[in-house]
């Protein structure tokens, strides 16, 4: 699984047996449909060639005869001139697709249909940066909007380290959200500096900004968040203040805080929500769509993120570390997926490396007689299998790398502080 590949929401198609290669009856077949058939048949022929190579000559001759019949059916199909709209075909389903760019809007009609990027005249698409202090519910909100758990969520602050891209697509729009690390003013490590760089680069690519605040806490101006995240408290980007966790306070308190934020902040609008239960999320979508420009979808409509599967595997392990260990241990850990091998006839093999800064931290991760690391591996494996919808063999190693949070070159290697390349 290579970096830069986008993860699809759909499950991979089932493998077809050799007997399934007989062409179905074709009462009506257009040139575009024939083109799709040739693509599918060529792939299946390569797959069958591997299977038949170890079989008998009779089996091989039968397959060659089937191929000739298939080619004759294709040639016959070229003669049909029926309208494409009248043809019922099965769209090829790809498991992975390369990250698209702005040239998607220049694709021809057939290719746009195959990628699911065809759009109506009023189609809207754009980027949204989600900012806020640590532990205010940014990741929970994005998971609700996207409809799938992409960002890990714990009750500890600064759980999100990387800039997570989530994609919410419908026929009329595509919202691309950046989940950013919590905005912090005092940067303790080089890692903190790199994470804040991620925040600023996300805003630089955005069409609008959501600032999430905790309704349970005393009202505060968002100038500091905009200053640290945007670089300018008087940004010209549309800003929505999201008052999260309204389910934890009384209705009368919500009204007072709404009035305060509307009076003392520069936000264009204020919307109270409960990201945990999804209350108010539709209102946020409506506000975002009112700010996004008209344009085609930047990504295929059936993907939820541009990150590869191995990225989310590492995030799942890191989430379990946050949930299982306390104090400084989760913050001292860096999780790297160093090997990911897909095996069609066996469990996928995944090898994960956990880096810590001290030998004492390594001992805590391992636990007495290795009990703690076994518990971590089991919890991680179960969630990974649920995410991938397949069985995996997970191997976890724990190593000591002193002061890795202060090593800028190492942090860049781990994906921190990279600039966003907006499509």
Swiss-Prot record:
GTP binds at residues 132-139, 179-183, 244-247. Residues 273-275 are annotated as: G5. Pfam families: KH_2 (PF07650), MMR_HSR1 (PF01926). Residues 325-402 form the KH type-2 domain. Residues 244-247 are annotated as: G4. The keyword RNA-binding applies. SUPFAM superfamilies: P-loop containing nucleoside triphosphate hydrolases (SSF52540), Prokaryotic type KH domain (KH-domain type II) (SSF54814). The keyword Chloroplast applies. It is found in: Plastid, Chloroplast stroma, Chloroplast nucleoid. Residues 158-162 are annotated as: G2. Its main location: plastid. Keywords: Chloroplast, GTP-binding, Nucleotide-binding, Plastid, Ribosome biogenesis, RNA-binding, Transit peptide. Residues 179-182 are annotated as: G3. GO terms for molecular function: GTP binding; mRNA binding; ribosomal small subunit binding; rRNA binding. Residues 132-139 are annotated as: G1. Residues 124-294 form the Era-type G domain. GO terms for cellular component: chloroplast nucleoid. Residues 1-60 form a transit peptide. One of its GO terms (biological process) is ribosomal small subunit assembly. PANTHER family: GTPASE ERA, GTPASE ERA-LIKE, CHLOROPLASTIC. Nuclear genome-encoded probable GTPase involved in ribosome biogenesis in chloroplasts. Plays a role in 16S rRNA maturation in plastids and may contribute to the assembly of the small (30S) ribosomal subunit. Belongs to the TRAFAC class TrmE-Era-EngA-EngB-Septin-like GTPase superfamily. Era GTPase family. HAMAP family: GTPase_Era. This is GTPase ERA-like, chloroplastic. It comes from Oryza sativa subsp. japonica (Rice).
């Amino acid at each position: 699984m290579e970096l830069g590949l986008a993860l699809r929401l759909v499950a991979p198609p089932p493998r077809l047996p050799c007997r399934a290669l007989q062409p179905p009856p074709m009462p009506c077949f257009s040139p575009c449909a024939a083109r799709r058939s040739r693509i599918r048949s060529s792939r299946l022929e390569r797959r069958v060639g591997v299977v038949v190579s170890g079989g008998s000559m009779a089996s091989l001759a039968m397959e060659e005869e089937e191929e000739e019949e298939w080619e004759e059916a294709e040639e016959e199909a070229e003669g049909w001139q029926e309208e494409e709209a009248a043809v019922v075909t099965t769209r090829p389903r790809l498991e992975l697709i390369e990250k698209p760019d702005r040239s998607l809007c220049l694709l021809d009609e057939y290719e746009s249909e195959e990628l699911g990027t065809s759009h109506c005249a009023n189609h809207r698409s754009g980027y949204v940066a989600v900012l806020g202090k640590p532990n205010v519910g940014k990741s929970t909100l994005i998971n609700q909007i996207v409809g799938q758990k992409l960002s890990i969520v714990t009750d500890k602050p600064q759980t999100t380290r990387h800039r997570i891209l989530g994609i919410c697509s419908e026929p009329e729009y595509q919202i691309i959200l950046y989940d950013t690390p919590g905005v912090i003013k005092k940067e303790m490590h080089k890692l903190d500096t790199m994470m804040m760089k991620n925040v600023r680069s996300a805003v630089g690519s955005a069409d609008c900004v959501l600032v999430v605040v905790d309704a349970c806490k005393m009202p505060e101006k968002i100038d500091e968040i905009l200053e640290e995240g945007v670089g300018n408290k008087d940004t010209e980007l549309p800003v929505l203040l999201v008052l999260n966790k309204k389910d934890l306070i009384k209705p009368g308190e919500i009204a007072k805080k709404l009035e305060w934020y509307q009076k003392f902040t520069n936000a264009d609008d204020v919307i109270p929500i409960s990201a945990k239960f999804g209350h108010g999320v539709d209102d946020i979508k409506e506000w975002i769509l009112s700010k996004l420009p008209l344009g085609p979808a930047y990504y295929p409509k059936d993907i939820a993120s541009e990150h590869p599967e191995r990225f989310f595997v590492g995030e799942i392990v890191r989430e379990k570390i946050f949930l299982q260990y306390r104090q400084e241990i989760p913050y001292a850990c860096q999780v790297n997926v160093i090997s990911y091998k897909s095996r069609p006839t066996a469990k996928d093999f995944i090898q994960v490396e956990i880096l810590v800064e001290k030998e004492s931290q390594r001992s805590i991760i391992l636990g007495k007689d290795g009990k703690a690391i076994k518990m971590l591996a089991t919890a991680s494996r179960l969630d990974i299998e649920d995410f991938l919808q397949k069985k995996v063999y997970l191997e976890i190693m724990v190593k000591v790398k002193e002061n890795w949070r202060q090593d800028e070159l190492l942090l860049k290697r781990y994906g921190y502080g990279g600039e966003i390349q907006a499509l």
